[in-house]
A protein has these predicted regions:
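Secondary-structure end/capping motifs
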Residues: 199-280
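Conserved C-terminal helix/tail region of periplasmic/extracytoplasmic solute-binding proteins
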Residues: 269, 273-307
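Short polybasic/polar patches that bind polyanions
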Residues: 26, 67, 122, 169, ...
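Short, glycine-/small- and polar/acidic-enriched structural segments
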Residues: 1-139, 156-160, 175-183
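Short glycine-centered helix-capping/turn motifs at secondary-structure transition points
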Residues: 22-23, 50, 153, 252, ...
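Pocket-lining segment of extracytoplasmic ligand-binding domains
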Residues: 145-234
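Small-molecule pocket liners
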Residues: 81-87, 185-189, 193-194, 268
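Short, hydrophobic alpha-helical packing/hinge segments within bilobed ligand-binding/sensory domains
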Residues: 42-46, 143-149, 164-165, 246
Length: 307
């Protein structure tokens, strides 16, 4: 078996757990080693140094490093194409406009989740600085910490992913639905162009394992819930109903054929461009290498999983 080191960023990259625990790497001749690496730069440096062969996540930094250091990180596949966040807030908050002059919890200032928060405010005509919305940073992409800050009224609100909307309703917090936001996020399979060029068969086998795991996730609910319960009960302090809610919401977003959409790519690029204008010299499609996925798709492999 070929040993492959993966890095994943956070506990809501649920398809990664199924890829690992479901035995899909072994099925395609791979020994998958899965490393939890919350820090963005640590994950990316590990990929560039060869410590990791693939990473799941890292959506802003590859554009910056392409400009600043000439690094050649590429994206191979995208599991989900829209960001399913909700605003979890204290009961007196009824809209984003009510957050003027208030505190909100944010994950990783200057990084992807916080850039999305800024875009959410821009979409309704607000500006974090001008409208005196104070961002309180939560380190290490710790969504449970952000949630507890709202619950304990340290902040007025936080933009949260499922299942924290479910927990919020049970705990008496306000959950405000937001418009669907096409976005590259979460389980994005990335490597370097050098590794892909030198290891084409391995890349194809990783993609086979990846799409097979997505198929399993969407069609084998009972076993997938068992895997998620094992991984998330302690990590995110979740109970059975919350995990089932997370499962249902995740299935809605997963792509059977994990191609990115142009709208999701554009939105990621644009919100990164606002924060880091230097990336304007890069075409947003420059980082995407989909020929491996297309080859797998045209072979009939993905369609065959769903027959």
């Amino acid at each position: 078996m070929i040993r492959i080191n993966f890095a994943y960023r956070h506990s809501l990259q649920t398809a990664v757990f199924v890829l690992n625990e479901g035995g899909f790497c072994r099925k395609y001749g791979l020994e998958g080693i899965f490393n939890h690496v919350p820090n963005t730069q640590e994950a990316e440096d590990g990929l560039l140094e060869g410590k990791y062969n693939f990473i799941f996540g890292n959506h802003v930094e590859p554009y910056l490093d392409r400009v600043r250091r000439g690094e050649k990180i590429i994206y191979l596949a995208q599991a989900s194409n829209y960001w399913p966040d909700r605003l979890v807030a204290n009961p007196e908050i009824n809209s984003l406009e009510d957050l003027k002059g208030k505190k909100i919890a944010v994950l990783a200032k200057g990084d992807h989740p916080e850039l999305i928060v800024r875009q959410r405010f821009r979409d309704v005509g607000l500006d974090i600085e001008k409208d005196k919305i104070e961002e309180v940073e939560v380190e290490k992409i710790n969504m449970m910490k952000a949630y507890k800050m709202v619950l304990e009224r340290e902040v007025s609100a936080a933009f949260m992913l499922p299942p924290f909307d479910y927990k919020a309703k049970k705990d008496g917090l306000k959950v405000i639905e937001l418009s669907p936001f096409p976005q590259i996020w979460g389980v994005t399979l990335a490597t370097t162009s050098d590794f892909a060029d030198k290891n084409e068969e391995t890349v194809m086998n990783v993609l086979k394992a990846f799409v097979d795991a997505i198929h399993y996730f969407t069609t084998e609910k009972k076993r997938t819930l068992e895997i998620l319960s094992k991984e998330l009960t302690d990590a995110l302090e979740l109970e059975g109903d919350a995990i089932e809610h997370l499962y249902k919401e995740t299935v809605k977003t997963l792509e059977k054929k994990p191609y990115p959409t142009l709208e999701a790519i554009r939105n990621l690029y644009n919100l990164t461009l606002v924060a880091y204008p230097e990336i304007k010299v890069i075409n947003p499609l420059m980082l995407w290498d989909l020929h491996f996925l297309r080859r797998l798709d045209e072979s009939g492999f993905i369609d065959g999983l769903y027959k």
